[in-house]
Amino acid sequence: MSLRFHTLPTLPRAVKPGCRELLCLLVIAVMVSPSASGMCPTACICATDIVSCTNKNLSKVPGNLFRLIKRLDLSYNRIGLLDADWIPVSFVKLSTLILRHNNITSISTGSFSTTPNLKCLDLSSNRLKSVKSATFQELKALEVLLLYNNHISYLDPAAFGGLSHLQKLYLSGNFLTQFPMDLYTGRFKLADLTFLDVSYNRIPSIPMHHINLVPGRQLRGIYLHGNPFVCDCSLYSLLIFWYRRHFSSVMDFKNDYTCRLWSDSRHSHQLQLLQESFLNCSYSVINGSFHALGFIHEAQVGERAIVHCDSKTGNGNTDFIWVGPDNRLLEPDKDMGNFRVFYNGSLVIENPGFEDAGVYSCIAMNRQRLLNETVDIMINVSNFTINRSHAHEAFNTAFTTLAACVASIVLVLLYLYLTPCPCKCKAKRQKNTLSQSSAHSSILSPGPTGDASADDRKAGKRVVFLEPLKDTAAGQNGKVKLFPSETVIAEGILKSTRAKSDSDSVNSVFSDTPFVAST
């Protein structure tokens, strides 16, 4: 029991002794009354501003609690409905209210009007099936809301409207089938929400086109493990990107990210999402996810690099800060060694090294429009000297190969079309052509004339051998008939060459006139 001792007022001496004792009793009675001192109920345990009424089979809040308490624990009771009258008194200083492990099935509007300054509300392990619009609208200062281990299957887009200071929201262990994207986009988005736990629900996929719009500082606190995801390369690229950025939501629960194929049955084996060569997803698909979240900047070792923050909210009323790959905060007008941030959002790396490569997040905060935007930029650091030498080697090899091919083609063309032909070759070609054309008109061509040149006289005479034909017809008595009634012409021509004699005279071996036997 908690008692307060106050200084009793000085009683007038004119009061009689009996009346004085009666007045003292009245003062003490007023001081220890429930409304003034807040005596601790028999079902609770009180410690100054902390009251615990756990596991007492309570269905409502005791009415004689001290009004200035800061923490009230009503877990493991039988509270089933939260309406406007479930708390009989107003707790203006109450900051933590614990209602886990009750039978709460519904929350009415105005249920928390008597606790306007709550910062932490625990409604976990109850029987809530949905969260309606403006359920928590009175809790303007609420920072942590625990709704895990319920039966929630529907969240109204305006369910958390007005909770502008909400930082952590626990929704794991429910029956949600869609990712609550309204928490990050739209009219009722929560700008300060940096922790969202929707693990172990029934969410089959993530809206990839919208999740890329979530600022980086909010992405770090999204927990998705334990959901029955459908295997997809886009989901894999998102999670592997978070894993490479060392998000605790993926690093700490790597083995709890699983998926199933469409063809799998309900009880089929789950596949690990975060594994190498997952479903043969191409590297371009994975990189596409990286690029969608920002830009890529190339820097050279030892050369000053300037990276601009391409934010749509950037103007004179915008403040910029950067977050490095190691979660180091980079701000303007601060000594950060190798880094420097200007007021226009530009990041300068004076002497980049390989260890400076990674994903940098630029956070632009517009004071006038009350907007903020996060731009993720991938900075790659490479060695210009090494890359240049490799480039020159590749160029030299390609140029040599091309030159060799051109030279080969030129030589082939020269060989085909520019081969020299001597005069003797041309003369022989002409003679062969003439002899073939005159074969049908004459049996033998005439020999060279007397005025022929010396070269022409080198050639021998042409002769014709006539093949005798046997006529087996009757009346020939086996005689050989050289020429039958119809003349048969043999066109076999034999060329012979006789060397020139010392006296420069050329004799004919055979006459030009063919010998014909008479019949």
From Swiss-Prot:
Any coiled-coil ranges, and where?
none
Residue ranges occupied by any Ig-like C2-type domain in the UniProt entry? 288-378
Of the GO CC terms on this record, one is: nucleus
The residues forming the signal peptide are 1-38
Query: Which ranges make up the Extracellular topological domains here?
Result: 39-397
The LRRCT domain, residue ranges:
227-283
Where found in the cell?
Cell membrane; Nucleus
Give the residue ranges for region: Disordered. Answer: 498-519
List residues of the LRRNT domain. 39-67
Annotated tissue distribution: Highest level in cerebellum, retina, liver, and lung. Lower levels in cerebrum, kidney, small intestine, spleen and testis.
According to its UniProt entry, one GO biological process term is: cell adhesion
Cystine pairs annotated here are: 40-46, 44-53, 231-259, 233-281, 309-362
List of glycosylated residues: 57, 103, 280, 287, 344, 372, 380, 383, 387
Q: Which UniProt keywords apply?
A: Cell adhesion, Cell membrane, Disulfide bond, Glycoprotein, Immunoglobulin domain, Leucine-rich repeat, Membrane, Nucleus, Repeat, Signal, Transmembrane, Transmembrane helix
Matches recorded under Pfam families: ig, LRR_8
Membrane topology recorded in Swiss-Prot or TrEMBL: Single-pass type I membrane protein
Instruction: Report TM segments.
Output: 398-418
Subunit structure and binding partners: Binds itself as well as AMIGO1 and AMIGO3.
What does this chain do? Answer: Required for depolarization-dependent survival of cultured cerebellar granule neurons. May mediate homophilic as well as heterophilic cell-cell interaction with AMIGO1 or AMIGO3. May contribute to signal transduction through its intracellular domain.
Family statement: Belongs to the immunoglobulin superfamily. AMIGO family.
What is the protein name for this chain?
A: Amphoterin-induced protein 2
Instruction: Name its species.
Output: Mus musculus
